[in-house]
Design a protein with these regions (language model features):
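Membrane-interface transmembrane helices that cradle and orient dolichyl/undecaprenyl
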Residues: 167-182, 287-296
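Transmembrane-helix motifs of polytopic, lipid-linked glycan transferases
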Residues: 43, 107-128, 166
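Transmembrane-lumen/periplasm boundary regions of multi-pass, lipid-linked membrane glycan transferases
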Residues: 204-301
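Transmembrane-helix signature of polytopic, membrane-embedded enzymes
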Residues: 3-4, 22, 26, 40, ...
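Short acidic/glycine- and proline-prone juxtamembrane loop motifs at membrane-interface regions
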Residues: 146, 152-159
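Short helix- or helix-capping micro-motifs
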Residues: 46, 137-142, 190, 194
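Membrane-proximal, lumen/periplasm-facing interface regions of secretory-pathway glyco-
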Residues: 357-422, 432-435, 439-445, 452-454, ...
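Specific aromatic-rich, kink-prone transmembrane helix
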Residues: 117, 140, 159-177, 186-190
Length: 528
């Protein structure tokens, strides 16, 4: 093993009159020295992870959420019904920078996976992992099915997972150095995370609880730098909070809808943690949880371990979706790498250590390849019919068929008499359908689509003169109440036999709007 390098010393302390009172001197950090980072190995693992994501970035098609964010990016705002403002902005910028291609849209999430791999290695080194442990931790992140699948798409999860990983890295630096100035970048990172997804609030609260529950870390809470970080975080998320307040807190309606899934989420929650991370690396993150909570070596970093455990339990109790706590595994893989790497170093001959490390990495890669089949569009889309991977990763099925659906809608629209088309709008039942029509409709000669779903409702009703409608996946009761005649004209199928939310969607022609769009539009609102 290479010789260990000394721990870098913290920078100069503030002047005596400016110094924070953070309590008595801390006990020694978890490690007296830090192992050298295997920079080439970490870079190779990160680069391979990014390359895999980019290689399949254009397969299948857009996810419904990506279509929605592209539409939202055309209506930039300080807030939206169902999420803060950052992801639509990223979608807009990515589209402008890459020419609006699907592969271009997914460059950012692919790069995010590479950063997560490097951060995992950096955290494990700070925790005291040797070179072998750092490589194991990085490889665990690179092959984690949850990270592979989530960072295949540009969604709110992209900046959210990055914010969690950076926050945990900064928390480790704070605990290791006991320099309270680390609260400032933590506050900035949490604030940026809140501008993408509210989920990181659970991590922030859990970290504060972890510090409060640990005697050696508790003095770090008595710091003006913590207050400054909190103020910055609040300032960064304030535009969204103000927007929500001005629009009647629509996010509460969305949350209420999601609570309807809580029972199912709890039923599959714990097994999902194993499936989503991967069977081969589950022992690693469990070891990391135990090491950070129970071992003497992990005592310095116990607040982070408490935070991860609290997030896991809290999301289960609240019935959150099983992937919500996914950001914690960067830390847990890194923590598990400390005892795993030490176990390898304890083997007597160097050949034995190398062969054992190679064997473990081979197992992780092999298991990761199986996870990649579930997480990524590696198989032909038609195979989803015979190999029902969408039962594990439903997002795969949500990326097929959108151009086909739009083409079917266009066929029915152009089948109408020209005079009728002049006053016919297109209505959809969900934001995915509306987003697909916005993305592919112009090429098929279709007018703008309208929907009552989430922010599409806020963007307003169809033109006042449009008294007829092509209605896709409508609330049939509402449609029949507001129009004189309603007739079924088509049923969409994806042609692959894949069961997804759009398979079997019905398309109607509705004529004779009984009132005005201004009068009936409130009834079409659907925050879900």
């Amino acid at each position: 093993m290479p010789a260990a390098e000394p721990v870098p010393q913290p920078g100069p302390s503030p002047a005596a009159g400016q110094q924070d009172r953070t309590g008595p001197a801390a006990p020694p950090a978890g490690t007296a020295t830090l192992a050298a980072a295997p920079r080439v190995g970490l870079a190779v693992i990160a680069a391979l992870a990014v390359a895999v994501e980019l290689a399949v970035s254009a397969r299948y098609g857009y996810h419904r959420d990506e279509l929605y964010f592209l539409s939202a990016g055309q209506h930039l705002s300080f807030g939206y019904v169902d999420q803060p403002a950052l992801t639509p902005l990223l979608a807009r910028l990515s589209s402008l920078a890459t020419g609006g291609t699907l592969a271009g849209l997914r460059v950012l999430p692919a790069l995010t996976l590479g950063v997560l791999v490097l951060l995992t290695g950096a955290i494990s080194r700070r925790l005291g992992a040797n070179r072998a442990g750092q490589l194991l931790a990085a490889l665990a992140t690179a092959t984690c099915a949850e990270y592979l699948g989530a960072l295949h798409l540009l969604t709110t999860t992209t900046p959210d997972m990055l914010a969690w990983a950076v926050t945990l890295y900064l928390a480790v630096r704070l605990l290791d150095s006991r320099d309270p100035r680390w609260w400032l970048p933590i506050g900035i990172t949490v604030g940026v995370g809140l501008a993408a997804k509210w989920n990181i609030a659970f991590l922030a609260a859990a970290l504060l609880a972890g510090f409060a529950a640990t005697a050696t870390a508790r003095p770090l809470l008595r710091s003006r730098w913590l207050v400054a970080g909190a103020v910055i975080a609040a300032a960064l998320c304030a535009p969204d909070v103000i927007w929500q307040a001005m629009h009647g807190w629509p996010n509460l309606a969305v949350f209420h809808h999601l609570q309807g899934e809580a029972g199912h989420n709890r039923a599959v929650y714990w097994i999902a943690q194993v499936v989503y991370t991967g069977i081969a690396v589950t022992p690693l993150w469990i070891a990391g949880l135990v090491w950070s909570l129970r071992s003497a070596a992990g005592r310095t970093f116990r607040p982070a371990g408490i935070a991860c455990a609290a997030v896991l339990v809290l999301q289960f109790v609240l019935g959150g979706k099983p992937y919500y706590p996914g950001g914690i595994y960067v830390f847990l893989f890194a923590a598990g790498a400390v005892p795993a790497g030490a176990g390898l170093a304890a083997l007597p001959p160097i050949a034995g250590r190398v062969s054992r490390l190679a064997a473990r990495m081979t197992v992780i890669v092999a298991a990761g390849a199986i996870g990649a089949l579930v997480a990524l569009p590696l198989l032909p889309a038609a195979a989803l019919h015979t190999v029902p991977l969408q039962k594990i990763n439903y997002d795969l099925a949500e990326t097929i068929g959108w151009p086909r659906q739009v083409a079917l809608i266009a066929r029915e629209y152009h089948a109408l008499p020209a005079a009728q088309r002049e006053h016919t709008t297109i209505l959809t039942g969900n934001y995915g359908e509306a987003g697909a029509l916005q993305r592919f409709g112009p090429a098929d000669g279709l007018p703008a689509a309208y929907s009552g779903a989430n922010n599409f409702w806020l963007w307003g009703p169809p033109p006042a003169g449009d008294v007829d409608a092509i209605a896709v996946n409508p609330d049939l009761r509402l449609l029949r109440r507001e129009f004189t005649t309603v007739r079924l004209v088509a049923i969409y199928t994806n042609g692959l036999g894949v069961s997804d939310d759009e398979e079997g969607v019905q398309i109607y022609v509705a004529t004779g709007l009984r009132s005005s769009w201004a009068a009936v539009w409130p009834a079409f609102r659907d925050y879900a």
